[in-house]
Amino acid sequence: MSAMNTPDSIDDEARYRALCSHDARFDGRFFTAVTSTGIYCRPVCRVRTPRRENCRFFEHAAQAEQAGFRPCLRCRPELAPLQRHWSVEDARSILVQQATQWLDNPQNWPGAIEGGATVARLASRLGVSDRHLRRIFEDRLGVSPLQYLLTRKLLAAKQMLADTALPITQIALASGFASLRRFNTAFGDHYGLSPGQMRRQPLSADSQRDGTPVQLFWRPPFDVAALLRFLAERQLPGIEHVQPDAPLGLQRTARVESGGLTHTGWFSVRFDPDANRLGLQVSDSLLPVLPAVIWRVRALFDLDANPLAINSALHADFPAGDGLRVPGCFDGFELAVRAILGQQITVAAARTLAIRLTERLGEAITTPHPRLHRLFPTAQALASVSPDILGELGIVRQRQAALQSLARAVVEGGLVLNAFADAHTTTQALQALPGIGPWTAQYIAMRALRWPDAWPVGDVALIKTLGIEGRGRAAALEADRQSAAWRPWRSYAVIRAWAGTHANPILTSGVPSP
């Protein structure tokens, strides 16, 4: 196999070939720094291809910026999909991937550039010393955790400068800087321009109306329609509206908590599969938390997936599934509630219960979109509601106990349901709650925690796909054995198995209901 086709170990010559061909499959997997200009670019950049001897290659934008290169204003490295290195065996790799997940989450950014306190806080959450974290991080990525974080924040600010009409002071706060002075200093030191100079191009009329447009990119292939069909079958009226046919898109209401404040509003997405991108419009009310909204939307649509790595492990067994992604969620608590409601019933029945719950406990919201007028219930609302009310909605007692135990755990802070949470610890915590078994816990890990190696034990559709139904407990053991070759991408294997089991991929009631 040539270096170009090896997903996790391409050499510089293969990178240069990808650059010459503007290969979108490598977008975000490396950046090219040009020594003659001092600029670094994405592989898809359409400027004149630099000479090979003038190119240096970096795996992360933070590495290029540490070496003194500035981001290209044309291809805009801040728009590239994020790079993920998943492992289920290497403890150091697992530590680094957990650290980068935390640093990538904009909800952890406010005030986070205040020196070593950030590293100490992160290390404490990971259960290691800050010295050990810095050493492992620098060994694996070539930059310190603070350097990585600063690059992520500055690139987010750069995107807002280019795509929104937000005042620079608000951009500084939204990208996690404690003051405008700190922001201006960091921006100027890194990019050689002030934020005002970076925003030299006049904003379009679209950027100055409610619903700020933002571009988000992905690596192909991506079967957008399949993912939207999955979401459309489960959509909740008033909260979301999914368009699985042209024009491909989604609209939904949103709630984001950040810095002790709650922001509510709406967003709308339109997909452009030919350009490997989507257009995201966000209500003005969500602009103060725009980086967090972008981060969640990327998770919802699995935009940072690495198809080359995934397909290298799964294509032989699932050749028709190369474009399938794992549907994520915008809010982990909402996903967990809907997963519990869907236990042992059909998709349609689970959706009916979720609609009733939303109509009874969800808050009303005013938007310019007639189909969007309600927010999903908060954990506090569900934790405090009378079980009798849940019973009136048709939710049986066992599910009531599971839902309210989940809600209380989230309210008390003992349960975190996002991509930073450790998959093993969180699934164990979920299973310790009444009425939540291994299948549901793994399903939540797959979609809310964005864990690529989730494995819903005993999944009927999966066992049928593997041709081992009718063997009782032996079937689950055999499924585990066969799945070893798919690690660390078993979540994607599950999605492909569900699609391959039915004539209408991902859309029939035979697919698990949550």
Model segments located where?
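HhH-family (HhH-GPD) DNA N-glycosylase catalytic core used in base-excision repair
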Residues: 1-514
